[in-house]
Amino acid sequence: MIIVSSCLAGMKVRYNGTDCLEQGIRQLLDSRQAVAVCPELLGGFSTPREPAEIIGGNGRDVLEGRARVVDRAGNDVTAMYIEGAYAALEQAHSLAARLVVLKENSPSCGSSWIYNGEFAGGKIPGEGVTTALLRLHGIEVISEEELAARLPELEG
C-alpha cells in the first residue's frame, strides 16, 4: 500500500482550504493502491488554519526538541505537528505502507525542502516533521515531484 498526502489527492485540507491535486496520485487512489492521509488534520488542526513553518531547524530537529513549529500568528504548534506525525506513522504501520508520497515544502510533509521559518516564501533543504519520523522508522518518503519517475514501477 502507498500513503499519499490528502491535499495531493484533491482534498481541500491545506492551511488555506485548497488542494494540490496531482493526477498520478489520483490514478493510484482510483486503482486502490493508495490511501490519503493528512498529518496536520490527524494532529488536530482544522481547515483553514494559519500557515506554519519550522523555526530553528528541520523536522528531525523538531522531533529531538531542538526546533519548533510556529504559525504566522506566533503560536507554538509543535505538539500538534508531532502528534500528527505519530498518527501518520501508526497508519503507515497498520497499512504496511511500502512508500509514502508527501507534499514538498510543508512543515509536516516536505521531503527535500521546507519553508525557512520567515513566512516570506523562502525555502531551505530539509524535511518536515512527519517525513523525518517516517524515515527514522525506515519508511521511504518521496515528494509529488519525484512521483512521475516512479509511476511505471508503482502501477506495474
Segments predicted by a language model, with ranges:
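Active-site loop/lid in soluble adenylation, ligation, and acyl-transfer enzymes
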Residues: 5-18
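Divalent-metal-activated hydrolytic enzyme cores
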Residues: 12-15, 23, 42, 60-87, ...
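Short, surface-exposed acidic-centric catalytic microdomains
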Residues: 20-70
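Glycine-rich phosphate-binding loop signature in dinucleotide/nucleotide-binding domains
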Residues: 93-96
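Internal, conserved structured core segments that host functional sites
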Residues: 99-114, 118
